Amino acid sequence: MMQRISLLLVLATLTACAQDDDALLEEVRDTLPAASEVRLDVPSTDNKSTLGAVAEFYQHTRNTSDFLNAASVVWVGLIQTIMRYPATSVEGDTITWGPWNDDSALRPFAYKLVAVRTGDRSITYSLSGKRRADAGDFIPLIEGAAERPDAGERGKGTLTLLFDNQAVIDVAKRERGSIAIRYDLTGEPRTNAVTFSDFVNERGEGPRDSEYGYLQRADGSGRFDFLTLANVDEDAAGQAENLHIVSNWDATGAGRSDVAAWGGNLGEVIWNVAQCWDASFLATFTSYAATGGAQPLLANEGDAASCAVSGETVAPLL
């Protein structure tokens, strides 16, 4: 009789442990970010017909958001893919997946994902990797922390992309430095902040530090404040200029960019540009002002009354 009771107690304990493991696994899967939570949703021309040239500074806004999305969404998607597989081990509050192999013959990498519960619906996680042929240790590629108030609700958190380490396992990677992303979808509006540290892009430009701020309201309107490089003066073969761009748009996608441009071929001159676009992303108004040169410049194209949103004062980040 005692032997039977002991066996039942063992089975009950094993069942409880399995249930705890399943609950932790479900909590981690639910808490870590989905790609949609880190993506910057700038209005798109994808589903609209555009007859004419797309507004230049709308295009800079879209290109920058596309770059940031490419840098983060792919990696978040990889984490979500790994978590669809059974966990390799569960020890206390720690879950490990891996080593997990990328199935593509052209990407011979192995990954390991470790997630640790640090509080009620609070998770820290690290995705590490190495080349499958190497005998060395896994090195961190992404580190993050995530919170979600309740299952199914919108969350918040941070994740950092470590490009120096990514280049160690993938020699084709040309980016260096790090990108840290802070996202918060728990309030209105949703916000994303992105910090570049010692970042070198795929063209070898950098290293540089910069901050990006994004918000999106429930109706689809939003704001994106960012720094980029582009050749905007008349010398097509010249150096790229620094652009500080603040873009705002309404629920239809119509919007306005306020821009400060400096450096490159501009020398001591600072340009301030305001450009408005309609719901098809075609420019409806552009104003140019240049200061610091021998002759100040002020010119307007189009109708200022066509601007769907108000402008902001934007200064160069000298």
Placement of each model-derived feature along the sequence:
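Sec-dependent bacterial lipoprotein signal peptides
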Residues: 1-15
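Short helix-loop boundary/capping segments
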Residues: 141-250
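Intrinsically disordered, low-complexity regions enriched in Ser/Pro/Gly/Gln/His and often acidic
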Residues: 68, 88-90, 242, 255, ...
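Short acidic, glycine-rich loop/turn motifs
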Residues: 99-104, 129-133, 165, 198-203, ...
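Short N-terminal edge-element motif at the start of the domain
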Residues: 78-176
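Hydrophilic extracytoplasmic domains
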Residues: 252-318
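Hydrophobic residues embedded in beta-strands of well-ordered beta-sheets
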Residues: 95, 122-125, 157, 190-192, ...
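N-terminal "mature head" segments of proteins
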Residues: 17-121, 288-318
